[in-house]
Amino acid sequence: MSEKPRRDTGGTGTGSGRSTGQSTNRTSNQQTGTGRTPTATGAHRQPANQSTGGGRSSSTGGRNTPTNQGNARPAAPANARSGNQPARGNNAPAASRSGGSTPAPVRGGGATPAPARGTNTRNARSQQSRGRPQPEEREREREAVLRRPPTPTTTRPVMRPRGPVALPPVMTVRELSEATGIGAADILKTMLKAGMIANINQQIDYETAALIMTDFGIETVENMPEQMVGIVEDVKEVLRSQPPEEMRPRPPVVTIMGHVDHGKTKLLDAIRSTRVAEGEAGGITQHIGAYQVEVNHRKITFLDTPGHEAFTAMRARGAQVTDIVVLVVAADDGVKPQTEEAIAHVKAAGVPMIVAINKIDLPTANPDRIKQQLAALDVIVEEYGGNVPCVHVSARQKINIDGLLEMILLVADLEDLRANPNAPAVGTIIEAKLDKSRGPVATVLIQNGTLHLEDNVLVGCVAGKIKSMFSDSGKRLRHAEPSTPVEIIGLEGVPQAGDILQVMDDLVLAREIALQRQRQQRAEAMAASARGTSLEELFGKVKQGQVKELNLILKADVQGSLDAIAHLIEQLNQSQNEVQTRIIHRGVGAITEGDVNLALASHAIIIGFNARPDPAARRHAEQHGIDIRFYNIIYQLQDDLKKAMAGMLAPTFKEVVEGYAEVRNIFRLPTREVVAGVYVTDGKITRTGQNVRVLRRGVVIHDGKISSLKRFKDDVREVTAGYECGLIVEGFNDIEIGDALEFYRQEQVAATL
C-alpha cells in the first residue's frame, strides 16, 4: 500500500537521493505486481539551481522529497510543457499547486520515458504527427481517385447531333461545345492546330465555328436571330425586291476616275462652277466628295474619288455605288498605271464607262494616241467600233462640258435607272468623320427610299436617330430622295466607309443589332489576331533580328484617308520582308493624350494626316520626346515612310581598296611578334581605319588589322607608295617574305527599300 505524501520543510540533498531511490524501487514493484507502467518521475536527477519555489509534490508510488531546500517541486516533463494532457487512469498523478502536470501511465504498454532535459518540443510534435498522412501520401491518394474509372451510373455518352447544327452568328467555345456535343478541350485543340489560341470563354464567329466542326464531321447552318431577319446586306437585292409599279426614275450617280493630276477635280469644278480644286492640298483630292448638279432640269450626282494610287480602296467603293464612270485621261500624258487600275475597277463593278480626254487645248495633246492605248487595254471607243463613248473636253477652258453632261444623261436613259422613293431609306456611307463640335458626321448616298428627319437608322455597327441633314452646299434638308448625297448628324458612333444605312422602326432594336455586330466584329478580329500570333513567323523573325518593325499610330480627318494609308503601308510591307510597318492604332479625329501615351509605351511614331494634336497631347509629346509627323499629301507620307523603313534596314558595306605592298624582310621581336618590312607598291597604308589582307601565291591566308606602323624608329600615321616601312599585323605571326599585302576600308552604304 502506498504511503501518503508528506510535506518536508527541512530536506537536504541526501534526503533527496533517498527519496529518489525509494520512488524507483516502488515503481519497479508496481510494474511487477500490477502490470501498469507509471512515468518514473524520479528517474532523472534535477539540479539544485532549477528550484521553482514551494509547493506540494505528489508521486505515483511513494514519497517524493524536494531536491532543494525551500519547498521546491520537481520540474514538469518536456512533453507536459508542450501542451499534451495527461491520460486519466487509476495511477494518474495529482497536479501540483502551481498548475504543473505529469504524464499519466499508459495502460497495457511499456513505460514511456519523459524526455530528457533540453529535448526540443518539435521532436515531440513530429512524433505525435507521424500517424497523420503526409502531403506525398495525400497526393498519391488524389491521383488514385482521379485514375479511378467512373461508375456506370455517372457515365453519360456524348450524343452527337444528327443533321446540321444551327449556330448563332457569334458564340463562345463553351456554347459551341454544348450545341455540338464536342468536348471543349477537343475544340480548343483543333483551334490550336489551326493556329488560333483561345480559351473556353472566348467568342468566335460562325465561320470559324463551321470550319472547326468540319474536322469532326458535323454540318452547321447559321441561325439568324429573329431581329436580324430583314436586315439589308446588299443594296442590289433591295432594289430587285421592290414592286415594279412603285419604281420611279432616279438621277444617275457618276464617279470620276483617272490618274493623278489629269484634271478630275478641275473637270468637276468646271461642271459645278465652283473652286473645289483650289481648296485641296497640293491639288489632289484627299477624300471622296459627293455633289449634285442640275442639268436641263435633271439632276446628276457626282462622286469625286482621289486620283493617287494609294486610294485604291476608296476608288473601289466609289465604283460599287456608282451608275456611270467618267474616265479622265490627259491628252498630253496618256494612259498611266492609275488609269489602268481605274479601268480594272470599272470592269469589276460592271458599270458603263465614258472616256473624257482632257486638256485638248494644249499643243502637245494627242487624242488618237490615247484611244490606241485604251484599245490595248480592251477599252474600245465608239470611233474605233466599240461601245465606249468618248468626249474631248478641256476643264481649264471649259470646252465641251455640256457635251459631256449630255452624254451622261444619254447613258443614264439607256440604263433605265429606277428606285422606289416610298420605301424606307437604304444607302451607303461614302465618308464618315468625327467632328469636334457636331460629333459623328457621315456622308451617305441614298440608293432606295427616302430618308427623313427623326428616322431611326442602323449603319453598320452603330445606330442613331437622324437629327439633321445637309446637302453638299450646306443647305438643311428635311428629306433626301434616291441618288441624293446628304451629310447626316445623329449617329451614336463613327461608321465605316462602305457601311449600309437602313431605316429601322425601333431604335432599341437597332442598338441591339449594332451591339451584336460589334461583338461579331471583335470575335473576328480576335480570331484573326490569334491566327497571326500563333504562327509567330513575323514575331520570331523580329526577335531573331531578321525583321524589324516600325510602329505607327495613325490619326486622320476622315475614314477614307485611314483606309488609303493602311493600303499604302500594306503595299510597302509586301514589297520587302526585312522591315515591317505595323499600325498599332488608328482613328478619326484629333491626336489625343491617350495616343501619345500609347506611342510612349509602344515606341511608335504618330502620323497626323489632316489631324492635329490638342494642347494637352502636344505638351505631353514634347515632354516625352514623342515624334509626331503631320501630312496633308499622301505621296509625301509615302516617301517619308520609305526613308524611315530604309533607316531600319541593316547597313550594307562596300569594300574600297586603298593600297598594296609586298613583304621584303622579316624581323622577330622578343615579344614573339613579327615585324614585316614592306614596300608600298600602290596607294597608301594608314595605321587606323584600314584592314589588311595577307595573300600568299594569290590565296588569302589572313585578314586583320594593323597594330603598329613605323618608318625607321618613328611611329607614322600613313605611308604612301614608293616608300618602305615596318608593320605588325595584329594577331598574325606567320607572315613570310614574298607575301602580298592588300589594304582596304569598309564604307557604309545607305540601305534602300
UniProtKB/Swiss-Prot annotation:
Cellular component GO terms, alphabetical: cytosol
Disulphide connectivity of cysteines: none
UniProt KW Amino-acid biosynthesis keyword: no
Gene3D superfamilies named in the record: P-loop containing nucleotide triphosphate hydrolases, Translation factors, Translation initiation factor IF- 2, domain 3
Region (G5): 394-396
Region (G1): 258-265
Annotated stretches, region: G3: 304-307
GO molecular function (one): GTPase activity
Domain spans labelled tr-type G: 249-418
Role this protein plays: One of the essential components for the initiation of protein synthesis. Protects formylmethionyl-tRNA from spontaneous hydrolysis and promotes its binding to the 30S ribosomal subunits. Also involved in the hydrolysis of GTP during the formation of the 70S ribosomal complex.
Family, as annotated: Belongs to the TRAFAC class translation factor GTPase superfamily. Classic translation factor GTPase family. IF-2 subfamily.
Protein name: Translation initiation factor IF-2
Organism the protein comes from: Chloroflexus aggregans (strain MD-66 / DSM 9485)
Lineage per the UniProt record: Bacteria, Bacillati, Chloroflexota, Chloroflexia, Chloroflexales
